[in-house]
Amino acid sequence: MMTVHRDKAAKRKKTNVACVNCSRSHVTCESQRPCTRCVKKGLEMSCVNAPRKRRKYLADVPEDQLPIPLKPADADAGPGMSERDGAAESGSKGPEHQFQDQGKIVHKPKFLSNAANLEYSTLSDIIHQDTLLNKIPVSLLYNGTDSPTPPSEALSGTHSASHGADVAGSRLSERPVHNVLNSMSSSRFVLRGLLGPQTDSILSSNVDLFKVHFPLVPQAVADGTLDFKRHSQGSMVAKKLRYDKSINQYYLSPACALPEVPNPNKHLCNGTVSFSLESRAPDEHQVLYRSDWPHSLRYGTPMEIYTLISEPFCHTSGFHSLLKYLHSRFHRHDLVEMCRSIAEFRPIFIASAVDLTEEDMIFMEQSYQRTLLEYDRFITQIGTPTCVWRRNGQISYLNDEFCLLTGWTREELLSKMTFIVELLDDNSVREYFKTFSKVAYKDFKGFEQMETCVLLSPIEGRTIECSCMWTWKRDVFGMPMMIVGHFLPVIAHPEPRDTDRLADSDFCISAGEGNPI
């Protein structure tokens, strides 16, 4: 008897991966499929390798990022495996594995805790097993075109659907944030009429507006509105008008009544299918950047900032253009006071930059762009009119609230070299240079508050009185890198009229008669 048991034990070889039935019964299995035990019990169709339990440190790693196993799971299954067994193995897999292989929806973990990721992923698998949502290919959900794939192809496992899902997956692997401002035609188009009487000759020439400064000139408007900005858009609107010559009748058509007011809902209708389970987080906002604007936010990701910026930003030409603009705007007495304030910090800038190499200057520009990208994430959420400019006064960033407050658009201020002093009145410009010379190197508290600051609008004679807070941001070398200005409008309360004063006095008299002392 002992010899017979030893022969059976010698014939039975242990395997690394047991089948589903043997693993459930906790018995020894074989490497061949179907195994001997499943054949005896009539379970050949379900005799497949049991799925491996994922390690805890791999619980939050997506399936496509897992390391490739050195040995496949069914390598021990011998070459004599029939087609029926292969079909049984593919059919016994869970629905989530089939849809994942075909490029269907996969719920990725979005929590910072591994335990929470494991718990919610398990609940998601239980809830979404064998549902219609899991059978919708990724190409249908994230396709930007207006003609999605037909339902017959979407719900089938054909090669075309799999190929479309692979293409959509490659698109999803790319950076999802697109540049909204790059889709506009020419940035010179918005500057018509805002550069003075020589606007047409300036825009028709090939002069670089980022190196040669042309100041903004507010326009005199009779009705006091921003209608002069819409004259250039009249041709585009006229093309959309529908007119019937036979009855001399115009038909209503969609037109933008206030083009200077941004519409937050215009990017929502993108032609894609929306599902609440696949919605993005609300903190993912659209980054507004332009790679052809060297002074503004040029890229939308940190990787692009650190890899694509290969030259420093030149502040010297900006300082020279700023001095020329001050000479053309102010009188001699005011220029002496401003130059005295500039002379207090300008030599320090030059002396601090003497020992810096070109690599240091490139790193300073990368730090500026990275800080500006980080500030964009919360400036768009606070809702306060905000403007950011460099240490030479050149504007590099502004939010929508600042555009609504002043009347200037983002393209008008950022599509050329524009200084913050162009948007301030004379008294505010004088206070600006005094404050800058005081905070730049004398006072390192980093912020300054101005109770009164008057902003200029595109309409001549129209100003906005504000109370502003300026914050200085320094780089790693201690030099002022950027100034962040928050502007809050001062709402003047109307003086009480004579009738209101008489009514208040009558109320006081009647109250005194009714309650004698």
Swiss-Prot record:
InterPro entries: ERT1_acuK_gluconeogen_tf, PAS, PAS-like_dom_sf, PAS_13, Zn2-C6_fun-type_DNA-bd_sf, Zn2Cys6_DnaBD
SUPFAM superfamilies on file: PYP-like sensor domain (PAS domain) (SSF55785), Zn2/Cys6 DNA-binding domain (SSF57701)
Transcription keyword on record: yes
Domain PAS: 371-443
Gene3D superfamilies for this protein: PAS domain, Zn(2)-C6 fungal-type DNA-binding domain
GO terms under cellular component: nucleus
Location of region: Disordered: 66-103, 144-166
Gene Ontology biological process: carbon catabolite activation of transcription; carbon catabolite repression of transcription; cellular response to starvation; gluconeogenesis; positive regulation of gluconeogenesis; positive regulation of transcription by RNA polymerase II
An MF annotation (GO) of this entry: RNA polymerase II transcription regulatory region sequence-specific DNA binding
Keyword Lipid metabolism among record annotations: no
Disulfide bonds: none
Domain of life where this protein originates: Eukaryota
Record keywords, A-Z: Activator, DNA-binding, Gluconeogenesis, Metal-binding, Nucleus, Transcription, Transcription regulation, Zinc
DNA-binding region(s) in UniProt: 19-47
Entry function: Transcription factor which regulates nonfermentable carbon utilization. Activator of gluconeogenetic genes.
Family: Belongs to the ERT1/acuK family.
Designated name of the protein: Transcription activator of gluconeogenesis ERT1
Species the sequence originates in: Eremothecium gossypii (strain ATCC 10895 / CBS 109.51 / FGSC 9923 / NRRL Y-1056) (Yeast)
